[in-house]
Amino acid sequence: MAGKRSRCSFSRLELILIVCLVLMISLTVVLLVLHFLSRNTNDCIDNIAEKAKYLVGVGRADCTGPVAQVPLMGYANPEQVGGGLLSRLYSRAFIVAEPQGSRRVVFVSADIGMVSQRVRLEVLKQLRSKYGELYRQDNVILSGTHTHSGPGGYFQYTLFWITSRGLIQPTLKSIVNGIVKSIDIAHENMKKGRLFINRGTVENSQINRSPFSYLANPQSERNRYSSNTDKEMVLLKMVDMEGHELGLISWFAVHPVSMNNSNHLVNSDNVGYASYLFEQEKNKGMLPGEGSFVAAFASSNLGDVSPNTRGPFCANTGESCDNPQSTCPIGGASMCMAKGPGKDMFESTRIIGQNIYLKAKELYEKASQEVTGPLSSAHQWVNMSNVSVELNATHTVQTCKPALGHSFAAGTIDGVGALNFTQGSVEGDPFWDQIRDQLLGEPSNETKACHQPKPILFNTGEMTWPHPWHPDIVDVQIVAIGSLAILAVPGEFTTMSGRRLREAVQREFDSHGSPGMNVVIAGLCNVYTHYIATYEEYQLQRYEAASTIYGPHTLSAYIQLYRGLAKAIALNGTQELSPGPEPPVFNVTSLTLLPSLSVESAPAGKTFGDVLEEVRPEYREGEVAEVTFVGANPRNSAENATEHNFLTVERYSNTSSSWRVVLNDASWDTRFYWSKGTRGRSNVTIEWHIPAGTEAGVYRLRYFGHYKKRVNFLRVISVPFEGSSSAFQITAP
């Protein structure tokens, strides 16, 4: 028996084979499970990605307008009239749409001082004629970068005519057509894409220009923040489904006033320079203003934020004037001016712009948080001169008819006023009040009481000749792109005003089932209503408070209104919002003091485009190549050509025996100066500030223009011409 094997027993070899078989079966089962789990998971991810896809389109178009004889918009200085070009102005448009639905939103950032009501109404009118109800007042945001170096004259309200010589049709037309064209380009190039958001801190690029006003806010509130400015940049990155780069929008709070009020060259200032750097980086080998990648550096709550980081100094003595009234011992407020980080305004513009660009580049490269979810938009027109604000269960207050205080005329440390006004004025000046009463009429007791403690200089809400001086009907608007909520605000919110608005809207979303929204403020949108200071800042009546035109409760009114829009979006109830009273359209097309274009002439023995002062034969990098031509009024070109170049820098190619354009007038390395002479004559000077790294070789500078020529007694025509410098050599360093 001992030698017999049991029926249930197996040899060692058989046991090994059985174990191997079991292991193989188990492994096969595991692999099959993993395969199907992986496939199901991938299918799920693919489905999520498919649902998360948007249609994305980007576009850029020129909106420069006339670069000569038109006052620049921003500093309200009638002496600051355009006299040439440093950089072109662009409208940058971004469209996001749901592939399977009709919902879409448009965000436009334009290199202009602010979006006026007239610009918005004209843009919406053109969009309606092209696209029907696809692009409307609720889903189109128009935002200005707030450059103070763009042509003025695109407003329909009387106050803005005073320093811009009325309504300037060429400016209005250029801005409107440029915005519409940028939207057209974005519309035509829509493709499936993805959006990513990122945020980070920008250092060494801003200061609070009214720090004493900021200190009036509750200490408990101020203790929650490390700075008296918002240093955070929010960036939205756009790519297509293959990962190809499309563009970006950056929101950051800083005034584009690195170029001061002595400047006469049209340009887009520090944020425009940031756009230029980013677009040149992404559109390799393209001229400035060309290429498919679009980078917008949009405005935010910049009301009290200056790029002039060295702070205010007395221009005559050099001592600091960082005091509550921003005044100097000798010369008063007119001598107190802030300084940027550079040796001059051109270098300061580049330094601040590059700081902003470098942070945006870092955030762009690291952006990984995807924006997903439905699109929504909410909009209302509101009569801001008569909003009831519920502060709490027992207290209700009112906004006021628009009015500007005495400190409005004082200007800021970025651009001082022309007369003996000072910031922080809580009492009127009998001299100026008497002049106001005689010329414009005394403010009503009701308006005076409503605006307390503001001493009223211009009671614009009660001034209606020849048209109202300020808007009553104002746009409030929120656009939601998934988890991103863009608050389109109609003016310049101060740092703390912006923080309060964002927090209030964030809480509203949170409490109605939409937690975790990324809330950003887009400034200078849709209609311009000056500044929005907090109630506490308003009591000190520095410039920003004196320019809070609807009274001390303006911010509270906006918070109430934007909370209502956020609630409607969160509850999918935007259709139930009352549209409100539509804004008026005034017939102001012929109200202008801009000089008419007249017949021009060249000096004896010369013709248009001839060289008057020639370039040198040789230059090195870091030097300035300069040539002066017999010129003509640049307004002729603006009114007779689209996206016309006034100049080119060209390099000679030995291989092709031809000249190749290497720079145009959108470059920040070139400058175009126009100077008007007598008897219909004028000169044009072109400068090329040769940057480091310029390739050695043979170059020339070319000039393009139009002059007015009389054909007969009744007819004047524009004649194109061009000129060229001699060839010159750039030698290796």
Residue ranges and their predicted role:
Residues A2-P733:
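Non-catalytic substrate/cofactor recognition surfaces at enzyme active-site rims
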